Amino acid sequence: MMRLLCLGTVLLLISPLSADGPRDNDPTTVRRVPRLGVDVPEEDVTKLNKGLDELAGMIQRVQQQGDQQAMSLLPDVMIYHRAVKDNLEHQEFFAPGDIQKAHRVLATGIERARQLIGGHAPWTSQTGLVVRGFISRLDQTVQPYGLVVPPTYRADGESRARVDIWFHGRGETLSETSFIDQRGRQAGQYTPAGTIVLHPYGRYSNAFKFAGEVDVLEALEHVKQHYRVDEQRISVRGFSMGGAACWQFAVHYADRWFAANP
């Protein structure tokens, strides 16, 4: 019995030492995350590239016009181009349905660009599901986030809205395209009355750490700039991986939240 106990102790001591060996850093043996996506039919590739070129031209047109208001809202358009372009280039459409999402996302981006060129930005005062974007101070990339704006919210009103940040769970196939499409079509399970719900993307599924952590803070600041927010009523919430993120933000930034609900 004593020998078995000693052997068990030795194995327990050895296992952590070998848990992160050289093989864990070999890209040929470590499981790819995310997995390689499906092959995209040539017809879809052609159509998506044509749409990307059209949207890129419209973005350039807004930039050339030099209107400061339009320029400040351009990230709300650029997120659609970046998502589809990157996911197409890196083969990050994981099911045939993702390809259809890309077509929808691209169409929305083109429509927004058309509105912005015409001097309009109706999504900025829209209630319900709204997808917005900001330029990261870390690497100057455009990053998306989703909002659920309550029907009672008025941009020109006097009252300020509570904001709940909802951290999404782990999803190895949650590309930017899928996230943007989801946030434009699904409110999620948590929509408290009179509350703006902020859904950060957080750079895929890194538990909202590293650049994902900074993205959350920047997304919140962007919301404060564009919406009437009650800064005394901002909370963090989440489930699964999002619950871990909630704990992290509750501990690291305890003075910022009136509640934390992992």
Predicted feature locations:
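Bacterial N-terminal signal peptides
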Residues: 5-16
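Charged, amphipathic alpha-helical oligomerization/scaffolding segments
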Residues: 47-54, 61, 76-83, 101-108, ...
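Amphipathic, heptad-repeat alpha-helical segments
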Residues: 21-77
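Amphipathic, non-membrane alpha-helical rod segments
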Residues: 70-95
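A domain-start/cap signature at the N-terminus of enzymes
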Residues: 20-38, 90-161
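Primarily recognizes the serine-hydrolase "nucleophile elbow" in alpha/beta-hydrolase
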Residues: 132, 232-262
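Active-site machinery of serine-nucleophile hydrolases
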Residues: 158-227, 258
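Soluble non-cytosolic domains of exported or imported proteins
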Residues: 42-49, 71, 75, 96, ...
